[in-house]
A protein has these predicted regions:
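Conserved mixed alpha/beta catalytic, RNA-binding, or beta-rich assembly cores of soluble enzyme
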Residues: 1-134
């Protein structure tokens, strides 16, 4: 057998096994589109986005719940503008859906410690992020 990563197949197996709350990390934007089409309730987290194209960033913004920015210019510019919430500034994580926004805010509420919450036009930039963005 091979050790290939097939995220849509993994989500299909999870639902077929009786799981009703399924989350998946994806690195290929096409997987986000495929999974969202087949399983609208799946929670999709896009990772490893450095170097993706503008079109791929748009696919993630339209189909993933959370998009990590890594060192991606396209994610910051495209997903960042469409995001409902941005967590972090050096390596932003963008909540693209209401359930992603709620998840991040619930994590903040349940965590001890201090947080800065401010309103801003997204994406909000930091002087400490990776350079260059690709």
């Amino acid at each position: 057998e091979t050790a290939d990563m097939d995220q849509p197949r993994g989500v299909r197996v999870a639902y077929a096994s009786g799981y009703s709350r399924v989350a998946v990390t994806i690195a290929a934007p096409e997987d986000a589109v495929s999974i969202r089409r087949m399983f609208p309730d799946a929670f999709i987290i896009a990772v490893h986005t450095t170097g993706i194209t503008d079109q791929e960033a748009l696919m993630l913004a339209d189909h993933a719940d959370i998009v990590t920015s890594c060192a991606s210019r396209a994610v910051r510019e495209i997903a960042g503008r469409k995001a409902l919430l941005q967590a972090g500034s050096s390596i932003p994580v963008f909540a693209m859906t209401r359930k992603a926004k709620d998840l991040i805010l619930d994590k903040v509420k349940s965590t001890d410690g201090q947080f800065l919450v401010t309103g801003a036009k997204l994406p909000s930039e930091s002087d400490f992020g990776p350079q260059p963005l690709v």
